[in-house]
Amino acid sequence: MNFNHVPVLLEETIDSLNIKEDGIYVDCTLGGAGHSSEILKKLSKKGRLIGIDQDINAIKAAKERLKDYENVTYVHNNFYNLASILDELNVDKVDGILMDLGVSSYQLDTPERGFSYMKDAMLDMRMNTENGISAYDVVNGYSEDDLFRIIKDYGEERFSRKIAKAIVKERNEKPVETTLELVKIIKDVIPMKFQQGGHPAKKTFQAIRIEVNHELEILNKTVEDGVNYLNPNGRISVITFHSLEDRIIKTKFKELENPCTCPKEFPICVCGKKPVVKVVTRKPIEPNEFERENNSRSRSSKLRVAQKI
């Protein structure tokens, strides 16, 4: 198992967490442990890292990479369940939380996982291969209207209606089973002049992956739960990879910083809702030119940080 995954915005993310050597930190997306290994280097033996991942292969790879550290707790679970995970571990408060929302290099580069539009494989795209619906179920089971909705909303694809219609037409003849079968359907309906700026299947694959893994639905809850468990001055750092995720994080941080619901004309707040965090990054931190050139998967990444009041 080759779980090589180059962490994006590594230095910026570690700096953003303001790591205390005796603190407790949660990596909600452990992956290949690129970020976690750097966190551990800054922790004393009294410090603790809790690493969560819903991909069992990520957990196995991280255990191997971090085998020299005894202050790591590994949790095979979805970070949606962050609150119950911390409760089960009898952890009342933590000093920092990291979420890296990108698909790992391992997942993209392992054809049988079905994430990549560059390699042929059965349609799958499940982060946790042990449960949930797969990309095959979405492509072959959703109505045309539902396919249109997710490709439009989650992929921001201008040809979403044409793609949805073409998928339904194709599957009426026979099921769409593989990634490259789906790629061909997409390519056939997108005009050639619109196939120049990036792979034509990228947005549709993103949309289906988000649907399969409920990626956007779980973000708001996880951020809110995470902030509740932060110590004062503790930080939550979130790396996003597309505008939908970034918008959700930006909006949620703003809501937590200014939760007041009083009408603007009220001279003072009477709703009683107090700020929970201070937003550290008014504009997201993005990779520098060197990282963009040397790690193509970093190019769309953005880091946003908030600090518990």
From Swiss-Prot:
Query: Which coarse location class describes where this protein primarily resides?
Result: cytoplasm
Keywords recorded for this protein, A-Z: Cytoplasm, Methyltransferase, rRNA processing, S-adenosyl-L-methionine, Transferase
Tell me which residues bind S-adenosyl-L-methionine. Answer: A33, G34, H35, D53, F79, D100, Q107
Q: Please give the residue ranges the record annotates as the region Disordered.
A: 290-309
Q: What GO terms in the biological process aspect are recorded for it?
A: rRNA base methylation
Keyword check for Cytoplasm: yes
Question: Could you tell me what reaction this enzyme catalyses?
Answer: cytidine(1402) in 16S rRNA + S-adenosyl-L-methionine = N(4)-methylcytidine(1402) in 16S rRNA + S-adenosyl-L-homocysteine + H(+)
Q: What is its EC number?
A: 2.1.1.199
Supply the InterPro entries for this chain: RsmH (IPR002903), SAM-dep_MeTrfase_MraW_recog (IPR023397), SAM-dependent_MTases_sf (IPR029063)
Q: Which domain of life is it from?
A: Bacteria
Any one GO CC term of this protein is: cytoplasm
Q: Which GO terms describe its molecular function?
A: rRNA (cytosine-N4-)-methyltransferase activity
Q: What's a Pfam family this protein contains?
A: Methyltransf_5
Task: Kindly report, in one word, the top-level EC class recorded for this enzyme.
Answer: transferase
Q: Which NCBIfam families match?
A: 16S rRNA (cytosine(1402)-N(4))-methyltransferase RsmH
Q: Which PANTHER family match?
A: 12S RRNA N4-METHYLCYTIDINE METHYLTRANSFERASE, S-ADENOSYL-METHYLTRANSFERASE MRAW
Free-text function comment from the UniProt entry = Specifically methylates the N4 position of cytidine in position 1402 (C1402) of 16S rRNA.
Protein's recorded name? Ribosomal RNA small subunit methyltransferase H
**Organism field:** Clostridium novyi (strain NT)
